């Protein structure tokens, strides 16, 4: 009976927040997710639970620091002070939440968010070249048409036109060179020969990835990042200079990764589980408490989170 009352009490405010103080641990993650219709939620989870029972510490509608802080402050202070490390992305709201609610915790920026910024910058450069290639191809076609000549695009060494080369190179730029297929290797050679700036940008992205991949200590990583900053500065690439400035702003929190090598990969994986759970119950509008009791165990927290009525719309 007491357990049912507890569940009923949680469901009464589930539209806005759910908190599970008993699930707090020394190493936690905070991340945002959009399980339905693009509506954002902030999820705080316990890394040691590994996605099983006791994983979710809190789920709050929205990402506003004040709203999330208000919900997390419902957890007793002595429990919040037990948290030793919190992993997160580089958003100011996440940093503020962590500082307010878990003052004893070391704040660690997720390495994968950093690497994604570099990949996005590289892809931005590729896309810019592709638009230029499309424009050049269109102009050449129009010129040939005006002259009454047949248009034949330039074909590169691997059989691609410039447009095709830039379109088909998207996925290989995400991968390390040692993981390229033979055709990707050939395409990369042509790409880098034709667009040297993409080769340099790819090298910057790869070197940043390698800094985080090496099992090194914090001081050594500090030196490696300083060298990377110098390379970025020498390149003159605007998008990479923006990344370098962002990393510099979060310098200590970025370097904290090398203490325990903690990431938000677990949180991202668990968020995917929540989305899958939401999709499996698409169309359900009214689930009775008796049915809720059947979901005890591994996914009880997921179920309670997904009782937020906007997720069921």
What are the residue ranges of the model-derived segments?
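Basic, amphipathic alpha-helical segments enriched in Lys/Arg and hydrophobic/aromatic residues
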Residues: 229-313
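Short, small-residue-biased leader/transition segments that mark boundaries at the very start
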Residues: 1-7
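RNase H-like nuclease fold core
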Residues: 11-85, 90-100
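Acidic, glycine-enriched active-site microenvironments
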Residues: 61, 84, 213, 223, ...
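Hydrophobic "anchor" residues on beta-strands that sit immediately upstream
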Residues: 27, 85, 106-109, 264
